[in-house]
Amino acid sequence: METCRCPLSYLISFLLFLSHSETACRPLGKRPCRMQAFRIWDVNQKTFYLRNNQLVAGYLQGSNTKLEEKLDVVPVEPHAVFLGIHGGKLCLACVKSGDETRLQLEAVNITDLSKNKDQDKRFTFILSDSGPTTSFESAACPGWFLCTALEADRPVSLTNRPEEAMMVTKFYFQKE
Amino acid sequence: MENLFQDTLLQSAGSEISISRVLRKLPETMFILYMLIMGVSAFTIQPEEHPGAAENCQFRGKYFKTDFRVEGEPVVLRCPQVQPWLWTSVSPHTSLAWRKNDSARMVPGKEETRMWVQDGALWILPALQEDSGTYICTARNASYCDEMSVELRVFEKTEASLPFISYPQILTLSTSGFLVCPDLSEFTHNKMDMKIQWYKDSVLLDQDNEKFLNVKGTSRLLIHNVSVEDAGYYSCAVTFTHEGMLYNVSRNIELRVNKKEEETIPVIISPHQTILASLGSRLTIPCKVFLGAGTQSTTMLWWMANNTKIENAYQGGRVAQGQRQEYSENNENYIEVPLIFDPVIREDLNTDFKCFVRNTLSFQMLHATVKEAASFSWGMVLAPLSLVILVLVGIIWMHRRCKHRSGKAYSWTMFKTGH
């Protein structure tokens, strides 16, 4: 039972099981957290980190592991999420310019994004699980998947050929 | 940005490029500028000033990663300004020089046989603990010069060093997955027949082991059906020959085994659709969600009033969402978020309150309506009455008990906590 500054009425409620006049005396709680931090690493065990403000995937040892970037995740719909880093202040987006499709980090707050806004669609990724791993397809760029290169320290990017052996599109994606 | 980066790079590596096309886009223009500054462009027309003397060199800071290696093995330090895959396009125009921070002398020194520079990288073979320190790479071309430092720490090859030098890798319980021997590219480059030996706790993993499969020609070890016992320290090693001498290059991996959290379809089990309340009183309506074995972490739970967020609808905070609670009963997971009225007013009787729950599998909603409780209720009369009776009974009981069993103070404690 929580501490309560109106014990009398609490006792009354308790004794008589009066469900309709339940009293809560705890101070108003903080807003429920809609954002969750997830660890992400690819099937080749590469984790994400920033190099010159660019998201790259590679291997971190010893005290370097504190550089690891975790993904901040806000669910949008079943199997669809917004993805960000740095406490949801930088969000992953699929941007098309000309015939080029690329992954971009944008300085927007993940909790300000809305699934109803068309311009926020580029931040939406569709999750699909296979066994223990997850793939991330861009909702704004259908057929384009979040990927890493086989080599370490290369940028995290998007590929439209997920079956190709040169790109890794399967990630372990687990809550902190 | 990266695609642009690579595209532009590939183009620059070629002989011809339309500059006007590149200039059309700002990011690309910025990249050109970057390349000019870096002096790595293959087509830059070099200005004749900037002699590039060491004192004019711009120091661009310390590389964000530290190299942790063990003594007796070869170590390769890469110049952080130049990514290895860019080296071939950069090398015709740029010279790289290395020096150690604590000495002005260049490395390798004249008498030095353990260190040399190859393809811009500093090789140390074999590394000694006293090689630990900060190394500065100076990249210079006709127009520009810049420096960055890299930190190297060479550890004794003992078990005590493992936590400082290991690469953590994670696999999921009861699935199969790979460990990867990292940062070996300098030693396995151009070698299709790379032979990596894998060890667990210093014991060589047998080729015919059903549990572990050393995937030929790759740096990967497949672990079948990962169990908790598979967690721990692994090492992988390749051999490297230099001037007739055989060296071991090893990397250490700490395998952690995680249990994957499963999601289930959440079920809202309370509130009841109609909640009775007296106007002017406080009211808490808990929205309680059953998840079974599913994870609480990915499940969102929130309230709305007439399709408006609670914090927007009641900016004064008369109605507010309480703290989210996550708990388990009999190994089943629940989440609860209360809606708190302080106090209930008539307007609330006509408001459509809704509790929403969402995770990646499902989205559900439940209506809750507040109804005014009858002004006279037996409950309200009985409540103070029963309390008075209870207290009286308690006092009498206490009194009698204290008389009979003096010194048994715990009975009072029991009475206090018993309710």
Swiss-Prot record, chain A:
Family: Belongs to the IL-1 family.
Compartments it resides in: Secreted
Name this polypeptide is given: Interleukin-1 receptor antagonist protein
Keywords: Disulfide bond, Glycoprotein, Secreted, Signal
Species whose genome carries this gene: Canis lupus familiaris
GO biological process: immune response; inflammatory response; insulin secretion; lipid metabolic process; negative regulation of heterotypic cell-cell adhesion; negative regulation of interleukin-1-mediated signaling pathway; response to glucocorticoid
InterPro entries referenced in this protein's UniProt entry, alphabetically: IL-1_CS, IL-1_fam, IL-1RA/IL-36, IL1/FGF
Function: Anti-inflammatory antagonist of interleukin-1 family of proinflammatory cytokines such as interleukin-1beta/IL1B and interleukin-1alpha/IL1A. Protects from immune dysregulation and uncontrolled systemic inflammation triggered by IL1 for a range of innate stimulatory agents such as pathogens.
Record field: transmembrane: none
Main localization of the protein described in the UniProt heading: secreted
GO terms under cellular component: centrosome; cytosol; extracellular space; nucleoplasm; vesicle
N-terminal signal peptide: 1-25
GO molecular function list: cytokine activity; interleukin-1 type I receptor antagonist activity; interleukin-1 type II receptor antagonist activity; interleukin-1, type I receptor binding; interleukin-1, type II receptor binding
